[in-house]
Amino acid sequence: MSKYNVMRWNCNKGGPGANCFNKKCRPKIEVFCDCFPRGISFGDVDGIVEINACGLMLEWKSNTEKLKYGQVTMYKNLSLLGILSIIHVVGNAETMKVTHMGTIFHGVQSSLFPATLDDVKDKIRQWVKLAEERKLYVPITW
């Protein structure tokens, strides 16, 4: 068994689409909409990891359209202190072919730029190196 957190799910168990992960396992987060003011609601997380009290969040999109206003606002606010960094990747999740990436850090969103999966991995490794060198509650920069 792999030590990595690999998605193990068979959407076709019981027939085509009968065991769809989104239907069977994702919470219906829209039921909480009435708990928040001003149209605010939960969003899903594509990926998140923590090392030495630093978080790296993966936001995966299938096209280069701008992130939604609420997402950008949240990511900028959560990244202000340097504890959370966001990597925005554009690509095909089925094939893992990446076309673009960008970052949000210290409240600043970069523009998307052409990238490959290897570029994304390199950026993640840069973040890991800095996070591993970090002393608790001292913001990192990359």
Give the location of each predicted region:
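Hydrophobic transmembrane signal anchors and adjacent membrane-proximal interface regions, especially
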Residues: V6-W9, V31, V72-Y75
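N-terminal first-folded block
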Residues: G14-E50
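Catalytic cores of nucleic-acid endonucleases
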Residues: D34-F42, S62-S110
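Conserved catalytic cores of phosphodiester-cleaving nucleases, focusing on short active-site segments
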Residues: G47-V49, C54-N63
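Alpha-helix C-cap/termination motif
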Residues: E50, L78-L81, L130, R134
